[in-house]
Amino acid sequence: MTRILAIARNTFRENIRDKVLYNLILFALIMILSSLALGQLTLGNEQKVLLDLGLFSISVIGMLISIFIGIGLVYKELEKRTVYALIAKPVHRHELILGKYLGLLFTLLVNLAIMTVGLEIAILYAGRIGFGGHLRLLPAVYLVFLSLALVTALALLFSTFSTPALSALFSFFLWIAGHFGKDLQSFGEITKSAAAKWICNILYYVIPNFANFSVDSRAVIQDTAYFQPMTPFAIAGATLYCVLYCAAIISISVLIFMRRDFK
């Protein structure tokens, strides 16, 4: 466990030196400020516009950070040949994968905190939400973090056997497809083809269901904009789904990485 945490710490240090990271955070803060301006132009809907665009900005920028940094976690080690030095040391391959993953998760957590503070400042400036509303914003941000943990696991998986370009493409495709799981399931229910129904059902359960964490869904927007609290059961269900899915993806990543020949 000590070696995993050491790798995670080094990964975090490497990530915070990445200029792309700061550019994306800056862009997210600009989008949040823009949502404040747009909210003032929509009479009667300032609060909803501010929260909607603010959460959307945090989600999308977080996704880009997860993919563009996640796809290089393993590839950079291979390209710089530092993986050979790590493997030569008393470091197991699964420890390298877990350490890289935890390091990026901590990076995402810090970035989410920065962007959330920016959104909170914008909300305070607008003066449209009470203290309870600020607290109810946190569950939505937590759901964003769960979705990013899942995206990071996918990016790490693809980085163990593919190039950065293909890894980014695969990760982004699954992120998009994962928001239409219900549509895929509905199509499988109405289609008359048994083969199509079977394929749709398989894909529905295999493709990650990002709709569980979607911040643009009506439920989450109501939690933040209209002060309707999320149920602990819903939060626990989303957390359990994320943990189980990420555990499966990381396990596959470890198996693939352990089978690679670096000689």
Place the predicted regions along the sequence by residue.
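Hydrophobic core positions of alpha-helical segments in small-molecule transporters
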Residues: N23-F27, L98-G99, F170-F173
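Secretory targeting signals
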Residues: L29-L73, I97-L166, C200-N201, P232-I235
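Helix-capping/transition residues at the boundaries of transmembrane alpha-helices
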Residues: E14, Y75, L86-A88, A155, ...
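Helix-loop-helix units of permease transmembrane domains in multi-pass membrane transporters
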Residues: L73-L105, F257
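Short cytosolic juxtamembrane segments of multi-pass membrane proteins
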Residues: L166, R259-K263
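Aromatic- and glycine-rich beta-strand/loop motifs that create alpha-glucan
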Residues: M1-Y22
